[in-house]
Design a protein with these regions (language model features):
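Membrane-embedded helix-loop-helix hairpins and adjacent transmembrane boundary segments
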Residues: 1-370
Length: 370
């Protein structure tokens, strides 16, 4: 996709996309590595550092060999395994925990007031600090993630739209079903430490089901998250072996291309692992950061595909650049300082400020030319 941006606009606009997509790939790799290793630590007692190394190494080894083909196979395997877990584990937990009444009792969350906060100050805080970035980040996700463009280009043109719609429904049910385990935890009165909230499902399963269920969940998590890791390896290999390679090398040499791609994979593995070792790092902070970043290119990318004549090179470069440089740091500061105004403002500037600036500068630029 960045190649399309280069041809349509310029190299410097392409650079914005490459930097954004590399940061996103690194964060996506890190969050899944952290989620998997932390879950395995809870269920097995093995320090998460060791499991993180193992997960990254396994995904790296077979990605070196087969690349994008491996991601197709592992994604298919992942969806089968995860759906098996949804069908077997979730109903079993609900039944043993006391049935649907326990789920209903947990709808209000640990405090019991979650279902009644609409219209209150607390609802505004939840929306400003989490809801806005999470919702908009998910909407804009595919537009700022190189792995989605890879999948689109790997599918026959006539099947792209249908494939993405069907895939969304197949996967969309999974987080809804797995989310019921969180309500079970709240409804049954389980006390889960704040630093372990990200592994709630694993704790709930271990609390209500026998050891075999936890072992299967370990396998499910490992298989599912390793599949995501290899997707990011494939994504970064595409960028380093194609986009970055083509910037500095005019002659295409297959061996050198593969070398660039593999170096990119290794660097991604190291960077992602180092992020997981940051003291106090949480899944939530990583997710919200890259959700805001990738959503900043969402609307400009959509317009560039559908109505490219509305945009100019300067509009794309300065519009997205200014919005990202101002909005993302503002959002990060707001999260670290626990400042609601900064958090919400950063989200809005990065996402909506981006498209407003892109269109405004493009319009001004075209007037100057005419």
């Amino acid at each position: 996709f960045s190649g399309f941006i280069k041809e349509k606009f310029s190299k410097r606009v392409q650079n914005i996309y490459i930097v954004e997509m590399i940061i996103l790939a690194t964060c996506a790799f890190a969050i899944n590595l952290l989620a998997g290793s932390k879950t395995l630590e809870v269920l097995t007692g093995i320090p998460f550092t060791y499991t993180a190394i193992a997960m990254a190494a396994i995904a790296l080894l077979y990605s070196f060999r087969t690349g994008l083909k491996a991601t197709v196979i592992t994604e298919m395997f992942k969806i089968i395994v995860v759906w098996t877990g949804v069908i077997l584990i979730v109903p079993a937990v609900i039944y043993i925990a006391g049935g649907w009444e326990t789920v209903q009792a947990g709808l209000g969350g640990m405090r019991g007031d979650g279902a009644s906060i609409i219209g209150t100050e607390r609802a505004w805080v939840v929306f400003a600090t989490f809801g806005a970035a999470a919702f908009l980040g998910h909407l804009g996700g595919p537009w700022g993630d190189n792995s989605f463009y890879q999948r689109a280009f790997a599918i026959q043109k006539k099947s792209v739209f249908k494939s993405f719609v069907i895939a969304a429904f197949i996967f969309g049910i999974i987080p809804i079903m797995m989310g019921l385990l969180g309500y079970i935890g709240a409804g049954s009165g389980m006390e889960i430490p704040g630093n372990m909230v990200g592994t709630t499902n694993a704790i709930v399963i271990a609390n209500f089901l026998p050891a075999w269920a936890s072992l299967f969940f370990v396998f499910l998590v490992f298989a599912g998250l390793v599949a995501i890791l290899d997707s990011q390896f494939s994504s970064i290999a595409n960028m380093t072996g194609h986009d970055i390679y083509n910037k500095y090398k005019k002659k295409v040499d297959d061996k050198t291309v593969i070398k660039y791609a593999r170096v990119g994979m290794v660097v991604l593995a190291i960077a992602g692992f180092l992020i997981t070792q940051i003291p106090g790092i949480t899944l939530l902070y990583i997710f919200l950061f890259f959700a805001t970043l990738r959503a900043a290119v969402w609307l400009p990318s959509l317009i560039a595909i559908v109505k490219p004549k509305l945009l100019s090179e300067q509009g794309m470069f300065y519009g997205m650049g200014i919005a990202i440089i101002i909005g993302v740091p503002m959002f990060v500061y707001g999260k670290l300082a626990k400042s609601l105004p900064y958090t919400l403002s950063g989200t809005l500037v990065a996402i909506f400020g981006s498209v407003v600036l892109v269109l405004a500068i493009s319009k001004w630029n075209k007037k100057q030319i005419s």
